[in-house]
Amino acid sequence: MKRFMVSFARLSRVVFSVGVAALLGSLAVPAHAVTIDWVTVGDPGNAADTTTYGAVADAFQIMKYEWTNSRYVDFLNAVDASGTNPNSVYNTNMGSDVRGGISFTSGASPGSKYAAKTDMGDKPVNFVSWWDAARVANWLQNGQGSGSTETGAYTLNNNTSGNAPAVNVGALFYLPTENQWYKAAYYKGGSTSAGYWDYATQSDTAPTAVTAGTTGIGSAGSAGNFANYIDGADWNGQNGNVTTVGTNGGSSAYDTFDMSGSIWEWNDLTGAAGSTRGARGGYWSSFSAFSLSSSSNIAIDPSDESDVYGFRLASPVAVPEPATYAMALAGLACGGFSMWRRCKRA
C-alpha cells in the first residue's frame, strides 16, 4: 500500500504540475463567454424514416436556436481582435447586404471591431460557409477566447476551400450529421419507433408563412404551424428577410426552433471527409413548402456563402459550458495537489 501511495503521489504531482495546468491554460474562460441553449435528442437507436434518413444510434444535443449574428460577433471579436480577417471568417456582405447582420469598423478598438447591425443581433447569421461554422466549433472546443480555430473538432489547416475534413474523434462541438439534423427536426420522439413528421413544426401540413414587424420579429411567436418562407417576412425594405430566432412558429418534438424555413442550415452529411456538405430546412424565400420538408435536402460546396446559409451546432450529451469544465479542472487540480500532499506525508 505504501508503494502504491507513493506511486499515486508521483502521478498526482505530474498531473498537477503539467497536465492540469496546461488544460486550465487552454480552457481559460473569456469575460463574455457565449452560452448556448442545448436540447437533448434522445430515443437512441430509433428507426430511420422512409426517406432512409433519421436513424441515430446515440443520444446527442443540438442547439435550440440557430447561431445568431450576436454570437458570431462574439466569435469574430475573440479570434480577430485586430480586424485582419484570418481565413476569411468575415464576409463583407454581412455588412454591405441589407440581410447581412454584422458591421466592421476598422478604426474601432481591438476586440470591438465587429458589431451586430441594428435589429439584427437576434437574427440567424448568414453569409457563412461550412468552413466558418467548423471554425466556430473549434473555437468552442478550445474554450472560446482567442484560442485556435484550426484544431479541435476539425483539423482545418487554414483551408477555406477544397474537401471538408472529417470531424475528429472526441469532438465536443460539431456540425450535426444529416441523420442527427433530420432526427432533431422531424422525429416524433417518445420511443424508437415513433415515426416522423413532414415538417419541423410537428405537422404533416405545410406551414403558414409568417410575417414580421418593423424590427424583424416573426408574427407567430413560438407556437403554431408557421415558418419563415415564401418571402412572407417583409421588413427593413426587403421582400422576404431573416427574422428573430424562435419567433416563427412551433418547435420540433425535441424543442428546436426554425428548422423549417428561416435559413438553410449546414450539416456534416455522414461526418466523413468529402467534397460536399449538406444543407436542410429551406429558407426565408423558399417558394414551396417542399424545401422545408423532410423530403428536401441539398449537397453543396463547403465554401459556399450567401444570405441563405446558416448553422446550428451539435454536441455529445451533457457537455458543460466552458466555465463549468474549467471549474471542474480546477477542482481536479486542487484535488490532485491535496492528494499528493497527503500521500507525501504518509
Tell where the protein language model's regions lie, with residue ranges.
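N-terminal secretory signal peptides that target proteins for export/translocation
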Residues: 1-11, 345-346
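Bacterial N-terminal signal peptides
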Residues: 15-26
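N-terminal signal peptide c-region/cleavage motif recognized by signal peptidases
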Residues: 28-30
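Disulfide-stabilized, aromatic/cysteine-rich ligand-recognition loop
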Residues: 33, 249-252, 272-319
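GGW-centered surface loops in extracellular recognition modules
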Residues: 33-51, 164-166, 170-175
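Active-site microenvironments of metalloenzymes and redox enzymes
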Residues: 54, 61-178, 184-210, 272
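Short, well-ordered junction/capping motifs at the entry into regular secondary structure
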Residues: 121, 163-168, 212-215, 221-260
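A short, hydrophobic C-terminal helix/tail in secreted or cell-surface proteins
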Residues: 321-339
